[in-house]
């Protein structure tokens, strides 16, 4: 009984301490004698698509005030009205949030991610300026900002606000020209999920094939961490490193990946299988002088649906890197318009004209790919070849029909 009572007392005291600590996050006044330590937290990627790129937080620790908070940008809610539509449109507003340090670690422990902590050697004046700026950001009128996937996200905002707090000449190595492109970094982040990688490749244009800009726009959390690790600052003639040695404060959970049949059906496997199937069906059509309406209906439907998404992004979205996508040449809504004519009699002339124009457009696509900076990938080439074969097959069958008549 005595052990139970002791355990109960300990739990109550711990809960009280945690509650007091959390309350202090929102009610902290700094005195001149208070010491502030600052560090950068970098979380590794998670399993959900919005977790694939990791996360960044700024830890502010004021022991005398029992303040141990993490400010982090990039908060959003799926419950916001029309969130999905606004996200595709590029009109989503993200927020800055504040969590207790231990809650931050718990959140990522549940997710299975690792967290690294990089101590930043800010002076007390700089730390106070940073803390004041973060607190000002937390005001309701300043809490939200317009999200940009490449240029204004959870990795860029911490870099910007810390930079504004520094007093001295910041020195960063800008001689490295062998920098990765945005697309390369995206592939590194989503590499385990081939379908996510393929989907993003379809939607993003040549802007993502430009090199990232250091130290201005890091794009990803681990790049922000790297920037601070390689930064020096000249304070009154004394050059010092801005950061210490990073340490892992939370280890990633090693989950056993369960392989399913779908795991082996990668976009490339699917594309090659489709190409082989299309070749076999097309050969049969040419021999029998007929058209497989079901085959074309399925293929045209998929291309048309994806085409609606691609053209919506191209014409209406405010997101960067979607407004000059050459995939719009072969993924477009016109495929859907053509489908009814496949099943209507006496529409051969219309379909012949469409396929003739489409044949020229698909050939032009292969030419454009050579000269533009956008990397479309081997999967797209295989899929476009399948479409080209369907178009050539239709034109060939119709020509044979004319000769038979």
Report residues per predicted region:
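Positively charged n-region of N-terminal signal peptides that target proteins for export
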Residues: 1-7
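Bacterial N-terminal signal peptides
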Residues: 7-16
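Boundary at the C-terminal end of the N-terminal hydrophobic targeting segment
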Residues: 21-25
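Glycine-rich catalytic cores of cysteine/serine-nucleophile enzymes that process amide/ester linkages
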Residues: 34-113
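Active-site nucleophile-His-acid catalytic modules used for acyl/amide transfer and hydrolysis
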Residues: 104-180, 382, 386
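Soluble non-transmembrane domains of integral membrane proteins
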Residues: 150-222
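Core alpha-helical transmembrane segments of integral membrane proteins
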Residues: 231-320
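Generic detector of multi-pass transmembrane helix bundles and their immediately adjacent loops
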Residues: 279-286, 293, 301-405
């Amino acid at each position: 009984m005595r052990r139970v009572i002791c355990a109960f007392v300990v739990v109550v005291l711990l809960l009280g301490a945690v509650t007091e600590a959390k309350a202090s996050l929102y009610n902290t006044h700094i005195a001149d004698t208070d010491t502030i330590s600052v560090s950068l937290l970098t979380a590794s990627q998670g399993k959900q698509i919005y977790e694939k790129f990791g996360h960044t937080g700024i830890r502010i620790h004021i022991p005398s005030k029992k303040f141990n908070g993490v400010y982090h940008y990039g908060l959003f809610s799926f419950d916001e009205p029309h969130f999905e539509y606004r996200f595709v449109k590029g009109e989503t507003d993200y927020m800055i949030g504040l969590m207790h340090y231990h809650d931050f670690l718990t959140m990522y422990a549940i997710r299975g991610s690792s967290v690294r902590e990089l101590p930043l050697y800010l002076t007390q004046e700089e730390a106070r300026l940073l803390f004041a700026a973060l607190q000002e950001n937390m005001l309701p009128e300043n809490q939200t900002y317009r999200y940009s996937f490449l240029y204004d996200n959870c990795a860029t905002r911490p870099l910007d606000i810390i930079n504004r707090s520094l007093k001295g000449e910041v020195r960063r190595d800008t001689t490295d020209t062998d920098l990765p492109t945005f697309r390369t970094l995206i592939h590194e982040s989503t590499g385990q999920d081939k379908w996510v990688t393929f989907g993003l490749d379809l939607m993003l244009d040549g802007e993502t094939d430009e090199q990232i800009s250091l130290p201005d726009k890091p794009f990803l959390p681990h790049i922000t961490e790297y920037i601070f690790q390689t930064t020096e600052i000249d304070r009154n003639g004394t050059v010092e490193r801005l950061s210490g040695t990073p340490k892992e404060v939370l280890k990633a959970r090693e989950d056993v990946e369960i392989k399913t049949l779908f795991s082996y059906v990668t976009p490339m496997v699917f594309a090659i299988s489709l190409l082989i199937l299309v070749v076999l069906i097309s050969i049969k059509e040419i021999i029998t002088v007929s058209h497989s309406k079901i085959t074309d209906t399925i293929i045209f439907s998929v291309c048309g649906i994806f085409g609606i998404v691609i053209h919506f992004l191209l014409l209406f979205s405010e997101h960067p890197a979607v407004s000059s996508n050459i995939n719009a040449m072969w993924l477009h809504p016109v495929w859907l318009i053509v489908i009814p004519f496949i099943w209507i009699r006496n529409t051969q002339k219309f379909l012949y004209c469409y396929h003739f124009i489409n044949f020229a457009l698909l050939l032009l696509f292969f030419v454009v790919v050579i000269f533009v900076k956008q990397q479309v990938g081997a999967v797209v080439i295989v899929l476009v070849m399948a479409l080209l074969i369907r178009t050539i097959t239709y034109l060939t069958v119709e020509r044979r029909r004319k000769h038979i008549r």
